[in-house]
Amino acid sequence: MALATRATGGAGRRKPVRARCARGLHLVSCHKTQLLGFTIRNAASWTIHPQGCEDLTAAASTIIAPHDSPNTDGFNPESCRNVMISGVRFSVGDDCIAVKAGKRGPDGEDDHLAETRGITVRHCLMQPGHGGLVIGSEMSGGVHDVTVEDCDMIGTDRGLRLKTGARSGGGMVGNITMRRVLLDGVQTALSANAHYHCDADGHDDWVQSRNPAPVNDGTPFVDGITVEDVEIRNLAHAAGVFLGLPDVPSATSLSATSPIVSHDPSAVATPPIMADRVRPMRMRLVFEQADVVCDDPALLNDAPVSISSYFD
């Protein structure tokens, strides 16, 4: 029996788990696999979980789960290479697509880890879900060369979301590109969060501390995130929130070639990322310990401001 409760307002969920729910479809070490023209509904946990797979295509398909069902991610490639997701409709209770690369063991074990590289997402509809395209939080093996383009994300909590979790996990995230994507009715459009608090130890001081720590094999790195031609409508909380580590500030490149079209006039200020001590806000672009480059900040109306102004 698995017990779970979901908090409202994008604030995460408490989920005491007594048993592991089954995946909808768990593919292990598969090569040259095609998943075409199918519908999967109401999986108990992650709907499709390719693990250690290579040359995988999923196309012209539908993935559905109740909107209040915990952990029902749509498609989670883990330690995979060369994955194409095209023309898939997602309507799930958690992240639509969450790219993962494993997690170190409790004593730092890493012999089971392998990188994820070469993930392409095209012509997909995400409506709704917690995140449209998510990296992490299990990313110890490293995630590289991920592209999402020509997609619509409607009513998702986040559009593009990176969450690295604890400092002990390690891993490198690099060359992540989002382009020609519509974000409509999202809460926070773009986020990178190195203090993600929803893991078991997420509220511990060594995860949430904003003080520098020694850089070692357990330090996660995020570098080379590019966003181009993204249109944001009915925005609730923030266009972009980037909270990195003081040990290694995230390098995030924003090519803002389309303006924010509109805010949701009914939205209430809310903490825009899942990290401790961040107060409610409604801002355009905020950052802390992150190197943010915006081609034309005027398109965002407000210059970037420091998120530390919103720490409790």
From Swiss-Prot:
Repeat region (PbH1), residues: 80-101, 116-137, 143-164, 222-245
Chief localization: secreted
EC numbers for this chain: 3.2.1.15
Residues at the active site: D94 (proton donor), H130
An MF annotation (GO) of this entry: polygalacturonase activity
The protein's enzyme class: hydrolase
Record-level GO BP terms: carbohydrate metabolic process; cell wall organization
Pfam families in the record: Glyco_hydro_28
Reactions listed under catalytic activity: (1,4-alpha-D-galacturonosyl)n+m + H2O = (1,4-alpha-D-galacturonosyl)n + (1,4-alpha-D-galacturonosyl)m
Subcellular location per the Swiss-Prot or TrEMBL entry: Secreted
Any Gene Ontology CC annotation: extracellular region
Highest taxon, organism lineage: Bacteria
Induction field: By certain acidic polysaccharides found in carrot root extract.
Record key words, sorted: Cell wall biogenesis/degradation, Glycosidase, Hydrolase, Repeat, Secreted
Family named by the database record: Belongs to the glycosyl hydrolase 28 family.
Cited function: Seems to regulate the surface properties of the bacterium in the presence of plant cells or plant cell extracts.
Protein name in the entry: Polygalacturonase
Organism encoding this protein: Rhizobium radiobacter (Agrobacterium tumefaciens)
Record lineage: Bacteria, Pseudomonadati, Pseudomonadota, Alphaproteobacteria, Hyphomicrobiales
